[in-house]
């Protein structure tokens, strides 16, 4: 979880968020389907997934985006993300250990807001990038 309030003055360009690691399980897929309402059988039906040419069932893209979003929120604090977009580059598979990488790429002030831009990546243990993204957070200032 987060480290408490993070202020604009406490973050520098090049800072990295703590890495969040999660091994994707089939239980994650079923639980996410129930929570999201996304019951696409490609995420839970092995027979259908292999018949469609996939090696197995695979993770929901939005689950991956959510995992990366959790690491972002833990780093900049709840309610501070004002922009977040991602591109899905590869599927995630049960058994893969996924890990986040979040780096501060810029700090700026705009219209009285103290903004931090971040580059975000979710990759597996072999270094295959699954999700790439960017985010902007508006942080409180000490000043």
Which ranges hold each PLM region?
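Short, charged/polar low-complexity linear motifs in solvent-exposed/disordered segments
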Residues: 35-37, 49, 83-84, 111-112, ...
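HotDog/MaoC-like acyl-thioester-processing domains
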Residues: 1-17, 93-97, 101-143
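Short, loop-centered acidic/histidine patches that primarily coordinate divalent metals
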Residues: 68, 89, 103
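Mid-chain, well-packed structural core segment of small domains
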Residues: 74-100
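Hot-dog-fold acyl-thioester-processing enzymes
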Residues: 1-80, 142
